[in-house]
Amino acid sequence: MSGKKRTASSNRWMLEHFDDHYVKLAQKRGLRSRAAFKLEELQQKDQLIRPGMTVVDLGAAPGGWSQVAVKLVGDKGKVIACDILPMDPIVGVDFLQGDFREEKVLEALLTRVGADKVDVVLSDMAPNMSGSDGVDQPRAMYLVELALDMCHQVLAPNGSFAVKVFQGEGFDEYMKAVKEAFKVVKTRKPDSSRARSREVYLVATGYKL
């Protein structure tokens, strides 16, 4: 039964994907994923990224957010991207392939960051979905907790954090933890986020720890 559900869900996703306005627009603009529009919308509302900034992009593949970020930081800025999956090169983006939960990958990422702290941490990470909330939600919350931990390691005072979170068990506790670490936290649901998705984005500014 679960296999049939996943097949039906996969078929629905495929139909939505190929008939999706944002997918078509991404292809037209040469963007690697529709997710790029989510960061563009967050940027329009919250002005997270400015020229000259250093940005860390977690869960970067296939590169939609990195494409947007590297244009925003300009020639004097820096984008450091990391993903367990491979990603085709993007000019101006320093990409590290690996699982940053592993010590050697984390060390390599911190080496790329260097002595200076970063201005923005981005995370559009999501687990491979099984279709079971009891499995998927804990996995998703684990990833966002890792992203917040990365902020504690690399983010400069008054830095910013944008993270995709799935509403469900653990969300309220996570929101509390983010509010403890940042002066201002806003919840955003970009127009380019599918309406039926439980995903929202927390935009946190004014890092204070």
Curated annotation (Swiss-Prot):
Cellular component, GO annotation: cytoplasm
Highest taxon of the lineage: Bacteria
Catalytic activity entry: uridine(2552) in 23S rRNA + S-adenosyl-L-methionine = 2'-O-methyluridine(2552) in 23S rRNA + S-adenosyl-L-homocysteine + H(+)
Residues annotated as binding S-adenosyl-L-methionine: 63, 65, 83, 99, 124
Active site per the UniProt annotation: 164 (proton acceptor)
Any GO molecular function: rRNA (uridine-2'-O-)-methyltransferase activity
Function description: Specifically methylates the uridine in position 2552 of 23S rRNA at the 2'-O position of the ribose in the fully assembled 50S ribosomal subunit.
Family classification: Belongs to the class I-like SAM-binding methyltransferase superfamily. RNA methyltransferase RlmE family.
Name recorded for this polypeptide: Ribosomal RNA large subunit methyltransferase E
